[in-house]
Regions:
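Conserved, mostly hydrophobic/aromatic
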Residues: 8, 39, 47, 92, ...
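Conserved anion-binding
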Residues: 11, 19-23, 90, 97-171
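Glycine-rich, proline-tolerant flexible connector loops at the mouths of alpha/beta enzymes
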Residues: 46-64, 104, 165-175
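Conserved beta-strand positions in the central sheet of alpha/beta enzyme cores
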Residues: 48-51, 78, 101-102, 125, ...
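Glycine/small-residue-rich loop that forms an oxyanion/phosphate-binding "nest" at active or ligand-binding sites
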Residues: 53, 58-118
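Charged helix-capping and loop-helix junction motifs
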Residues: 60-67, 141-150, 175-184
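Catalytic cores of alpha/beta
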Residues: 73, 77-99, 180-216
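Glycine-rich phosphate-binding active-site loops on the catalytic face of alpha/beta enzymes
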Residues: 83, 94-112, 167-170, 198-202, ...
Length: 239
């Protein structure tokens, strides 16, 4: 199982939100590149980057920071937040970003998403955020009428091979992740590599996710608060 330590960017700073709430934001650092280097030093090979400003208002205000992160070397980087056009996808891929994550646009413009999946293949992942089992969009402010699992099946039929699935109730809470949900996704949507995201806060959870065949896990607040040690986690999933 791959591990993706997370860097969420707001105004060029490293931050974490609780349950996607911009009013419940904690700043953890002023230097995202230094943070990335510390992840590499702990053995990380991947990095999950979210442009929170882009997600909120579609701006590119963190573009230079993401460009600098992409130049770090030794890291496979996935980027999400405000990616709603092919031009933006091209812009990030040209930096050397490994894959772009489509979020709300996958719900609001499924035809566009299907086209991008066909054109760019594994350079595109889809981020599915679910609230009480239903897909949420636009910074989790709106909840659609479509169940998350059904939406994942539709994405798979459109050629999607990688889905980052977040249970909003768990995200940033440090209360543990929704293990039964990932078990259900693995059983009902075969052929898709799922990344677990939201609330992972123990080594036991990582091992359970790995045993059920989860492709990757995103670690955020658990690393910043010291609840999990990244070097130990990397060893754990490699052994």
């Amino acid at each position: 199982m791959q591990l993706f330590p997370a860097i969420d960017l707001r105004g060029g700073q490293v931050v974490r939100l609780t349950q996607g709430d911009y009013d419940r934001m904690t700043v953890y650092g002023q230097d995202p590149c230094a943070q990335a280097r510390s992840f590499v030093a702990a053995g990380a090979k991947n990095l999950h980057v979210v442009d929170l400003d882009g997600a909120k208002d579609g701006t590119l205000s963190n573009y230079d920071t993401i460009a600098a992160l992409a130049k770090q070397g030794g890291l496979y980087i996935e980027v999400g937040g405000g990616i709603r056009t092919e031009e933006r996808i091209e812009k990030y891929l040209s930096l050397g970003v490994g894959r772009c994550i489509l979020g709300s646009v996958a719900v609001t413009d499924f035809a566009f998403t299907a086209r991008m999946l066909q054109k760019y293949g594994d350079k595109i992942a889809v981020g599915v955020d679910a609230k009480d089992g239903y897909v949420a969009i636009h910074g989790w402010k709106e909840v659609s009428a479509e169940p998350g699992v059904a939406f994942c099946k539709r994405l798979a039929e459109a050629g999607c091979t990688a889905i980052i699935y977040t249970d909003i109730a768990c995200d940033g809470t440090m209360q543990g992740t929704n293990l039964s949900l990932y078990r259900q996704l693995a059983a009902q949507v075969p052929g898709v590599a799922f990344t677990a995201s939201g609330g992972i806060s123990s080594e036991a959870e990582l091992l359970e996710l790995q045993q059920m065949g989860t492709a990757a896990a995103i670690l955020g607040k658990s690393l910043y608060t010291g609840a999990l040690d990244l070097a130990r986690c990397v060893q754990l999933v490699q052994d």
